[in-house]
Regions:
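PLP-dependent aminotransferase-like
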Residues: 1-37
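Active-site phosphate-binding strand-loop segment of PLP-dependent enzymes
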Residues: 22-79
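Conserved active-site segment immediately N-terminal to the catalytic lysine
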Residues: 86-98
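Active-site C-terminal subdomain of aminotransferase-like
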Residues: 98-185
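Conserved PLP-binding catalytic core of the aspartate aminotransferase-like
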Residues: 193-224
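Conserved PLP cofactor-binding pocket of PLP-dependent enzymes
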Residues: 228-244
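PLP-dependent enzyme catalytic core of the Aspartate aminotransferase-like
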Residues: 241-275
Length: 275
């Protein structure tokens, strides 16, 4: 988001926390109180770098108390985590056709306060990011301003039907949460610890430290698991070596059991070769 603001020539300040800590709402309040020129606050809900789930409810409260606009990046949480948009003071929430929606990537969508959207007319700093113009075109013609991503829209419609058939966001969240719980449990049995503590661990993706005294590379582990039908993510959020495993998509506890079994086989095979 800071890169977007930089390229658009928007004055901004960055409040960072370490990857394993959530932004502090009181600190946000202090920053806003210290600088009345700040008009908008933007933050990520689910941070896929680490798997942490930020407390947007607490931050939204202090932002609204100070009359500022609150923007939430929910690219990797919308559809998989319940987000009471109005109750949490969110003015703009942005997500994507894929991730927890379980469609395919190709377009993003925004839920916005209508009055703020209308007030943004003529203020866009780029053609492609002119949200007001896109909204007005949709209102008049029901289409994109440029080439419509027809296949992605059809996939999105099917994904929304499947979300409803599953039981909605609550049911999908239960599945993701169980995937995450089982993953952490099985990894723990192999001596592999999660990077994020349970208080702030989200259900979307889980980051793990490498096992202690391991001498294998991520590439070796990745290729072993990939050759057997699964893929994991690299991770580098601290000085320590980490890797990530996603819990979302058409993934069920039996898939988690399988990938953990593959991890166990890899560790046993590698340790045997080392010895």
């Amino acid at each position: 988001m800071a890169d977007i603001a930089e390229h658009a020539g928007i004055k901004h300040q960055i409040y960072n926390e370490h990857y394993n800590k959530v932004p502090n709402a009181q600190k946000v309040a202090e920053l806003l109180d210290a600088d009345p020129a700040v008009t908008h606050v933007a933050m990520v809900h689910s941070e896929t770098t680490s798997g942490i789930l930020n407390d947007i409810e607490a931050v939204g409260k202090v932002v609204k108390e100070r009359g500022r606009v609150f923007i939430v990046d929910a690219m990797s949480s919308f559809g998989g985590v319940d987000i009471p948009v109005k109750d949490w003071g969110i003015d703009f929430i942005i997500s994507s056709a894929n991730k927890c929606i379980q469609g395919v990537p190709g377009f993003s969508f925004i839920i916005a306060r209508r009055d703020l959207l209308e007030a943004s007319a003529g203020k866009a700093r780029s053609l492609s990011l002119d949200l007001y113009d896109q909204w007005k075109t949709m209102e008049v013609d029901g289409k994109w301003r440029f080439t419509s991503p027809t296949h992605v829209v059809l996939a999105f419609a099917q994904a929304m039907k499947e979300l409803e058939d599953e039981g909605g966001i609550e049911a999908r969240n239960r599945r993701y949460t169980e995937n995450n719980r089982l993953l952490i449990e099985k990894m723990g049995e192999m001596g592999i610890r999660p990077y994020i503590d349970s208080t702030h661990q989200g259900p979307i993706i889980t980051t793990f430290f490498y096992p202690e005294e391991c001498h294998f590379t991520f590439s070796q582990m990745y290729e072993y698991i990939k050759d057997r039908g699964y893929a994991i993510y690299p991770g580098k959020v601290t000085e320590a070596e980490t890797f990530r495993i996603g819990n979302i998509g058409e993934i069920y506890p039996e898939d988690i059991e399988k990938v953990c079994a593959l991890m166990k086989e890899f560790l046993e095979e590698y340790n045997h070769e080392e010895n």
